A protein has these predicted regions:
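Short, positively biased Gly/Pro-containing turn/loop motifs at secondary-structure boundaries
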Residues: 323-354
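A short, well-structured alpha-helical segment
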Residues: 299-335
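Acidic, low-complexity proline/glycine/alanine-rich linker and hinge segments
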Residues: 242-285, 311, 324-327
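Residue at a conserved register position within TPR or TPR-like alpha-solenoid repeats
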Residues: 36, 71, 78, 113, ...
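Helix N-cap/loop-to-helix boundary motif
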Residues: 60-68, 102-110, 140-147, 182-189, ...
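N-terminal leader/linker segments that initiate helical-solenoid repeat arrays
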Residues: 21-69
Length: 354
């Protein structure tokens, strides 16, 4: 999912209260920012957004909404550039000003609330920020906005210890909205279909998972390359059919994976489906924390093979649960010269009590 809300278009700086027709250092810096947006250089976008915000402080009144819109631009640019801590601070500033200017439940708050949630570690506060955004979207009577916020919430919490049935239901509800509001080949709907299929597969509700994953494969088959979600759907169906003892059907999907055309000739392996490990009940009760470092091979079909514990802290149950979780992860495989190849991956799973 995208980091920002495509349905909102809340970056309002294109509509300044003050005219920008007269050349000034600020107007030139803002033009440079807009030009950078058209390119692919995230670092340049962040740099020009910061300059526009800096000069905007001398151009607009301190309580101007235009100034805080510039700060939202900066926060988003920093987030896209991987500078989460700095982005989070700016998102929080925007939230405070927007609440004063628009009200506590204004739709303008959705974008900075989501941004603030996405740029912080898993915590109760992160969950609360997502829930605030959902509540506002629900009141806005904008179904597609609500569906997008629900999917962002699911994606933001699915691989954390705050993943609950309620968070799972956000994805299911988003899928139902997309199914009613968008055509079958719409990307947002396809992504939701993929995730709901994965959820149903994880719950071993294979009769519901299979048609969803088959639909993903069908819709992506029109592309002239193999999308990561299509590959992951094939991989999950291999697992489902093997579990059901239907090896013939499983083999069909294995063959399909082997004949796929990569979306990049030198595509690195990429995680497509990750489940958070279970927190051992006895450890949680004792508020015991820890971590487990592991390495493993992502094979040509995107499955995790031969996981090995490199180091751990906190207890054997953390190690045991980490290994169980890792084996359920799915990747898009690495491609070299257009062919899938095994790749070595290292990860660290952390267990923290909030």
């Amino acid at each position: 999912m995208k980091k920002s809300l495509s349905g909102l278009a809340l970056v309002l700086c294109a509509h300044f209260a003050a005219p920008l027709s007269i050349a000034s250092p600020f107007s030139e810096s803002y033009a440079a920012y807009q030009q950078a947006l058209a390119g692919q250089d995230k670092a340049l976008v962040a740099l020009t957004a910061a300059k526009a915000y800096e000069l905007g402080q001398g151009y607009f009144e301190s309580d101007s909404i235009d100034l805080v819109n510039l700060e939202l631009n900066l926060a988003t640019a920093l987030q896209d550039n991987g500078e989460s801590q700095a982005a989070h601070e700016h998102f929080n500033n925007v939230i405070q000003v927007y609440r004063k200017h628009f009200g506590r439940d204004a739709i303008e708050l959705v974008d900075p609330l989501i941004g603030a949630a996405q740029t912080m570690a898993a915590s109760r506060e992160k969950v609360d920020l997502f829930k605030q955004a959902i509540a506002i979207a629900e009141d806005a009577d904008k179904p597609l906005l609500l569906a997008e916020v629900k999917m962002l919430t699911f994606n933001g919490l699915a691989s954390t210890h705050f993943y609950t049935r309620e968070i799972r239901d956000e994805a299911l509800e988003a899928y139902e909205i997309y199914r009613q509001e968008m055509p079958a080949d719409a990307m947002a709907r396809l992504k939701a279909t993929y995730y709901v299929g994965m959820i149903k597969a994880a719950e071993k509700k294979y009769d519901k998972a299979v048609p969803l994953l088959e639909e993903v494969i069908k819709q992506f088959s029109v592309l002239d390359f193999s999308h990561p979600y299509k590959l992951a759907a094939h991989a999950r169906l291999v697992e489902i059919y093997e579990a059901e003892g239907e090896s013939d059907k499983s083999t069909q999907h294995c063959v399909a994976i082997g004949s796929m055309k990569p979306w990049s000739e030198k595509q690195e392996q990429a995680p497509l489906y990750r489940e958070a490990p279970k927190y051992p009940i006895s450890y949680a009760r004792d508020r015991r924390e820890g971590w487990t470092q592991m390495s493993f091979t992502v094979d040509e079909q995107g499955f995790v093979r031969d996981p090995v514990v490199l180091a751990s802290e906190g207890g054997q149950q953390f190690t045991r649960e980490s290994l169980k979780a890792i084996k359920r992860w799915r990747y898009a495989p690495k491609f070299v010269d257009g062919k899938p190849v095994p790749a070595e991956v290292s990860v660290q799973l952390e267990y923290k009590v909030n």
